[in-house]
Amino acid sequence: MHSLVKPVLFFVVVRIVQYAIISLSPNKQFDLSTNLLLAKYCSEQETQQFWHRHLFNKLLSWDSVFFIKTAMTMDGYPEYEHEWAFSVIWSSLIRSVSPSNNFYTVLKTAVILENLIYFMAMITLFYLTRITFGKLDKSKTHLSDKLATFTAILFSCNSGSGFFTGPYSEPLSFLFSFLGILAREFSVTPIIPYGLEFKSSKIFYYTIVSSFCFTIATLNRSNCILLGFYYVFDSIYLIRRQKYKKALLFPVLAGCIVALFFVRQQFYIPYKNFCELRGEWCNESLINFKPLHFLTRKSLYSYIQSEHWNLGLFNYWTPNNIPNFLFGLPTFVILFSSTFYFSRVYPNYKLKPLIFITRAFTIIILLFAHVQIINRISTFIPLHLWYISDRFVKFEANKKMTGDDWIVKGYIYWLIFWVPIQTSLFVFFLPPA
């Protein structure tokens, strides 16, 4: 518990500083979305109250506008097609927790909930780090405590933390991603040098708990479907060793649970709700069998992203987006560096799935997405935080700089400047989003 004191204090200080930046910034925003939303649900007198004007109105920026707008609808569903790209799970949670449907009550509930979930994610990551690295080398438990402490501190001021002052959905996925990985860690014991033991007594934690957590993370943020590679990796491992029963009861069953809920959310429900009278993506069924017509070439989410935000292979690779590539560059570098570092330093089966997930995620964002969002959504994967923390602990021990230390040092310096700047840009409704 003593090791958690520093991360908790650091978390509180960072949040106070960020909210101070927001409160002291000018009240005008670059975009009119906030004013339009406020005009729809609030009186002029309400919007001009001191804390509303100086804090809460400013937190309605970028995606948070859509989350709160959906939370305020009569049926709890988005009003327009493009709004389905923003987590209905998160908006529904806000709506269900809020004690009333008053706009500012909903907004304040969302902000409190956001901070609580963000804090819980930090605590979960602390224990996940300690368990993961304690298992990798039980002779160095004190080092795993140091690693966990610094990782939790880093998480508090990660590259997307400015967005998480407002009601954003990402911390919910961070929390359940970490809980899912933690459940798997609890269920699987490493066998030195290159093996895993799947304990039958821990099947509930692996098959039910981890799949439940990964499902929530994925339904909230679809990029978390990559966490399913844990199950692919474990299935291959067990099948190669002819442990077919364990393969079926552990990773195959768990993976099917996540996949079924993902298909239901991304394909089945949108097809049933939208495809009776429309064409476009609805007419692109992959299987010519009526009960499975909902399995289309594109999901509703993919269609919205390509139609409304022009996502696609190399679509973002244009000269005018060079600044956005530069905004995301430090995070791309630290993510790729972490995969090479742990492939070289920790060639352990416990980290291999996460290395693959990190590489796949980074490449997908680089080629298909708005690259600057990597700063906001990448922290559902903790590998780069572990990389920075491990180098910090090792440098503290021997005081010798390596190539990795220079990368880590540069990234930390960038974070020191980036977090307050990005918080300010978010308040003004300015890029990068």
UniProtKB/Swiss-Prot annotation:
The transmembrane residues are 4-24, 109-129, 148-165, 172-194, 204-226, 247-267, 322-342, 354-374, 410-430
The keyword Hydrolase belongs to this UniProt entry's keyword annotation: no
GO annotations of cellular component type: endoplasmic reticulum membrane; glycosylphosphatidylinositol-mannosyltransferase II complex
Location in or out of the cell: Endoplasmic reticulum membrane
Q: Does the UniProt entry include the keyword Membrane? A: yes
- Keywords in alphabetical order, please: Endoplasmic reticulum, Glycosyltransferase, GPI-anchor biosynthesis, Membrane, Transferase, Transmembrane, Transmembrane helix
Coarse class of the protein's main subcellular location: endoplasmic reticulum
What molecular function terms (GO) are annotated for this protein? alpha-1,6-mannosyltransferase activity; glycolipid mannosyltransferase activity
Q: How is the protein disposed in the membrane?
A: Multi-pass membrane protein
A Pfam family matched in the record = Mannosyl_trans2
EC number(s) for this protein? 2.4.1.-
Which enzyme class, named as a word?
Answer: transferase
Could you give a single Gene Ontology term from the biological process aspect? Answer: GPI anchor biosynthetic process
Give the pathway listed in the UniProt entry for this protein: Glycolipid biosynthesis; glycosylphosphatidylinositol-anchor biosynthesis
- Disulfide pattern: none
Please give the family membership noted in the entry. Belongs to the PIGV family.
User: What is the protein's known function?
Assistant: Mannosyltransferase involved in glycosylphosphatidylinositol-anchor biosynthesis. Transfers the second mannose to the glycosylphosphatidylinositol during GPI precursor assembly.
Record's protein name = GPI mannosyltransferase 2
